[in-house]
Swiss-Prot record:
Compartment list: Bacterial flagellum basal body
Family affiliation: Belongs to the flagella basal body rod proteins family.
SUPFAM superfamilies the record matches: Flagellar hook protein flgE
Signal peptide, first to last residue: none
Keyword RNA-binding among UniProt keywords: no
One GO CC term on file: bacterial-type flagellum basal body, distal rod
Protein's UniProt keywords contain Transcription: no
Listed PROSITE patterns: FLAGELLA_BB_ROD (PS00588)
Biological processes annotated in GO: bacterial-type flagellum-dependent swarming motility
Oligomer status and interactors: The basal body constitutes a major portion of the flagellar organelle and consists of four rings (L,P,S, and M) mounted on a central rod. The rod consists of about 26 subunits of FlgG in the distal portion, and FlgB, FlgC and FlgF are thought to build up the proximal portion of the rod with about 6 subunits each.
Organism: Buchnera aphidicola subsp. Schizaphis graminum (strain Sg)
Record keywords, A-Z: Bacterial flagellum
PANTHER family membership: FLAGELLAR BASAL-BODY ROD PROTEIN FLGG, FLAGELLAR PROTEIN
Protein name, UniProt field: Flagellar basal-body rod protein FlgG
Length: 260
């Protein structure tokens, strides 16, 4: 097999992964708090046929060498944590983060996860939970006789009890930040989990230590740009076609060789 067949095959694999990433971005264009991904690639090792700087004669050296590449491989899918637009919902249970930070969520197995999706609900006990039913940490419990809930930009949650005029504070929504957001592991259900690459979670009050502010009655929309993803899809499709053409051309060359 001539090397160009294998090189083109690695190109096909890379563009297929790129298309998978783009498709997932487009599929989540309406997902609250979704952060788009991009595939990152690197070239494979090179075969050095002539080393640059070696002698070409007694008194001269080669100004450049001869190296043949062996293809490409994917190395990562990087999340782009740019801010999504804030969409007004007028629901008192919806909270958008404008800036860096994540809400902290308790999973059924006891582990902690993190989310940008602030479209919260109340469970049967009046506890603030995600759409999947996972409670927010610290716990926020809304009294059954409350008639109004207010969440401040700094995360302080207060309610007005029926028959009273002054609101009372019942809790605080904190934000979690990380040194390396790209190191977080995506779990699905709009959740992320810390890893060694992300660094330890930094618990802070909204608006402090580089975190964003909270906006009640809004949700953060996906940061996917449909037009940009469609352009990326066209480029990926063309790259896939070119690599396929390269395989066909290499095959024709092999056929010619076999006929000699």
């Amino acid at each position: 097999m001539i090397p160009s067949l294998w090189i083109s095959k690695t190109g096909l694999d890379a563009q297929q992964i790129n298309m998978n990433v783009i498709s997932n971005n487009l599929a989540n264009v309406s997902t609250n708090g979704f952060k788009r991904s991009r595939a990152v690639f690197e070239d494979l090792m090179y075969q050095t046929m002539r080393q640059a700087g070696t002698n070409s004669s007694i008194d001269t050296t080669l100004p450049s060498g001869l190296q043949l590449g062996t293809g490409v491989r994917p190395v990562s899918t990087e999340k782009i944590y740019s801010q999504g637009n804030l969409s007004k919902t007028d629901s008192s249970k919806d909270v958008a983060i404008n800036g860096p930070g994540f809400f902290q969520v308790q999973l059924p197995d006891g582990n902690i996860a993190y989310t940008r999706d602030g479209s919260f609900q109340l469970d049967q006990n009046g506890q603030l939970v995600t759409n999947s039913g996972y409670p927010i940490i610290p716990e926020i419990n809304i009294p059954p006789n409350s008639i109004n809930m207010n969440i401040g930009r700094d995360g302080i949650v207060s309610v007005t009890i029926q028959g009273q005029t002054q609101p009372i504070s019942i809790g605080q929504l904190n934000l979690i930040n990380f040194v390396n957001h790209s190191g977080l592991e995506s779990l699905g259900e709009n959740l992320y989990q810390e890893t060694q690459a992300s660094g330890n979670p930094i618990d802070t009050t909204p608006g402090l230590n580089g975190t964003g502010l909270l906006y009640q009655g809004y949700v953060e929309t996906s940061n996917v740009n449909v037009a940009e993803e469609l352009v990326n899809m066209i480029q990926t499709q063309r790259a896939y076609e070119i690599n396929s053409k390269s395989i066909n051309t290499s095959d024709q060359m092999l056929q010619k060789l076999s006929q000699l």
